[in-house]
């Protein structure tokens, strides 16, 4: 299962105004956060499921990182906290030479992914 920052460029929105689009994700990921603040989620995911809730929390964390200016991305790069890291393909696998070394896109060793994975566990219920 992979999550990753997307490769699209658009405008900005706040995480509270997140647009969600279901589509067939061609790269095998379940979802991606877009630079305009929207989230693309794979059409195979039941949008009302606990899995979708977890995925959306993960992608909203990426949107928050983008909004705060801590993260940005383009087709061939990811910016994290002011430093640029390049995307590559190695043996058919998309990797990023990030601050913690070369890891596949979506890997928890990337600090932006570690934060997003932690956000999946946050309970937002107001009981």
Predicted regions located by residue number:
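Short, surface-exposed charged micro-motifs
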Residues: 30
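Active-site recognition of the HExxH zinc-binding catalytic motif
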Residues: 54-67
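Acidic glycine-/aspartate-rich tracts in secreted/extracellular proteins
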Residues: 46, 69-70
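Metalloprotease/metallohydrolase-associated module, dominated by Zn2+-dependent proteases
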Residues: 7-27, 35, 73-127
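Short pre-active-site segment immediately N-terminal to the catalytic Zn-binding motif
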Residues: 37-56
